[in-house]
Amino acid sequence: MFDSTLNPLWQRYILAVQEEVKPALGCTEPISLALAAAVAAAELEGPVERVEAWVSPNLMKNGLGVTVPGTGMVGLPIAAALGALGGNANAGLEVLKDATAQAIADAKALLAAGKVSVKIQEPCNEILFSRAKVWNGEKWACVTIVGGHTNIVHIETHDGVVFTQQACVAEGEQESPLSVLSRTTLAEILKFVNEVPFAAIRFILDSAKLNCALSQEGLSGKWGLHIGATLEKQCERGLLAKDLSSSIVIRTSAASDARMGGATLPAMSNSGSGNQGITATMPVVVVAEHFGADDERLARALMLSHLSAIYIHNQLPRLSALCAATTAAMGAAAGMAWLVDGRYETISMAISSMIGDVSGMICDGASNSCAMKVSTSASAAWKAVLMALDDTAVTGNEGIVAHDVEQSIANLCALASHSMQQTDRQIIEIMASKAR
């Protein structure tokens, strides 16, 4: 798989990116439930007649208001129904990519007949949890996903247990690539990006290909809040400058518009999120195009952006009250700063300013308005880069920003991991009261 001469740590970096940067069709929380339903349906004897599902509060939060691709409908029930009736159990986050018009119609009919239920799992100590149980008469199959959007931990049917994930790691087995990131630094990541052979990271260019296609679709103006298309229109009217700053925001938000509005195109995700993948990709692509960067230079910038985003997000809960478009945009700031001058000091200053700027943005569930937060984060990232180029940044004397960028990141992640847990509960309570 790798050149045997490649630094073992760099191999783990590459594996971490390959593990966390994947194509995903549709918002990944509903898609996680759709995958559970699809795998359960594949285990069931006979066609699915009824679907029951249970999810964690966080997954419910991120599934209430987002459009499921191809359906024109929002919410977890349609995701569960379509996963069960038209999902590809072997396609991971692209579980709905082969869903036919007939499968969509059948899923809607199942919903209309009252044969689909989705409830919050109680009690639930997991942040990311989805369980789907499908029925054919008295026969049933049940699949549980925990911890990661595609991490199936249990499969069971009316005949007994089919699969249970072993919790322990076998002796001599290598640790997860993400575990390596807990012991690395941004400086080491930058060294990797500067020195790794281009051939070893060429694959990251696929993120530009997928997310640029999504952005172009978003500019059609028919998806979500059509923020990208609206801002582009205001450029034509002379109300917004046609410059690099506006291009970064327009093209990034357009991809999120299409993503959240239900376009049937995959996003290249990051850390289990399409919007994080878009945010880590599109600003870097726009700046690379501005400077006429070749494929190798673009790949290195994208690798820095995506790996930095993963590095920061790895210190957070998988889902939390902190909008992770902000942390993905910190990766984008690193990638853009690298394209402009490549200095570690510029990169670290840009990230510190980002932490001093958008770190309080909450996640109130996946919805069309995520594109607003994506556009804000992308804009803040470029602003932070411009400030860093002028040797200006939020300093360690201000707020949660420390004198060292690593400590600044740790402070932000501690806030999200601990204090913001109550914020998350309040958000879920507010959203649940709206749904009643």
Curated annotation (Swiss-Prot):
One of its GO terms (biological process) is L-cysteine catabolic process to pyruvate. Induction: 40-fold induced under conditions that maximally induce expression of the large pathogenicity island (PAI) also called the locus of effacement (LEE); part of the dlsT-yhaM operon. Slightly induced by D-serine. Pfam families: SDH_alpha. GO terms for molecular function: L-cysteine desulfhydrase activity. Disruption phenotype: No effect on protein secretion by the type III secretion system (T3SS) encoded in the locus of effacement (LEE). It comes from the Bacteria. Belongs to the UPF0597 family. Thought to be a D-serine dehydratase, however it does not complement a dsdA (D-serine dehydratase) mutant in strain CFT073, suggesting it may not have that function. This is UPF0597 protein YhaM. It comes from Escherichia coli O157:H7. The gene is yhaM.
